A protein has these predicted regions:
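Axial heme c-ligation environment in periplasmic c-type cytochrome domains
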Residues: 46-53, 68-103
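Intrinsic, low-complexity terminal and presequence regions
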Residues: 20-21, 47
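Sec-dependent signal peptide recognition
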Residues: 2-9, 14
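Sequence/structural segment immediately N-terminal to covalent heme-attachment motifs in c-type
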Residues: 22-41
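Short pre-active-site segment immediately N-terminal to redox-active cysteine/selenocysteine motifs
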Residues: 33-34, 42, 56, 91
């Protein structure tokens, strides 16, 4: 029984880690398409749009999921909700991987 539980826990950790390790190149392409006009090249931030480069992956995923759920959490929430709602889990992971890599 302990072996089965250890296997289940290991499998869950593997799945959660793979969800956090998105495709940087796919994230770069999606960022250029959807995010760069406001957040600047490589996520450096522009005017009232925050710097995203180098942020931790779990933080970025959490923020995008919050916006995707329709929750307002900042002054640009309406725009962010509109931009995040069409994103899939994979696209969010890809964006997070790309932005995290921009250090």
């Amino acid at each position: 029984m302990k072996g089965l539980m250890l296997g289940v826990v290991s499998f869950c950790l593997l799945i959660s880690n793979s969800a956090l390790s998105g495709d940087i190149e796919a994230g770069k392409a999606r960022y250029a398409q959807n995010c760069g006009n406001c957040h600047g090249p490589g996520g450096m931030g522009l005017a009232s749009y925050p710097k995203l480069k180098g942020k931790e992956i779990p933080y970025l995923i959490d923020r995008l999921n919050t916006y995707r759920a329709g929750t307002k959490i900042g002054p640009n929430s309406d725009l962010m909700i509109m931009m995040a709602q069409p994103l899939s889990d994979v696209e969010i992971a890809n964006l997070a991987a790309y932005l995290n890599a921009q250090k």
